[in-house]
From Swiss-Prot:
It comes from Rattus norvegicus (Rat). This is Serine protease inhibitor Kazal-type 2. As a strong inhibitor of acrosin, it is required for normal spermiogenesis. It probably hinders premature activation of proacrosin and other proteases, thus preventing the cascade of events leading to spermiogenesis defects. May be involved in the regulation of serine protease-dependent germ cell apoptosis. It also inhibits trypsin. Residues 1-16 form the signal peptide. The record marks 48-49 as: Reactive bond.
Amino acid sequence: MLRLVLLLLATDFAASDDSLDSSDSQLIKRSQFRTPDCHRFDYPVCSKHLSPVCGTDMNTYGNECTLCMKIREDGSHINIIKDEPC
């Protein structure tokens, strides 16, 4: 009976491990993150132009300028994962 339970657990673990392999292809590699170009923005005001970006902190920012404002205020290091909402 114990062998059967262990065999079922091992089979279930192997199946879940396969699903991890298939989802790895959907993950974004760190080398693909884009560094925001914060030098091109005039502070302390950003335009209201909506062009969402997804930061590496998994927050969506209204545009690259608002992400740069967050970096400037907090001193945090946030890159851009993609040019659309998270």
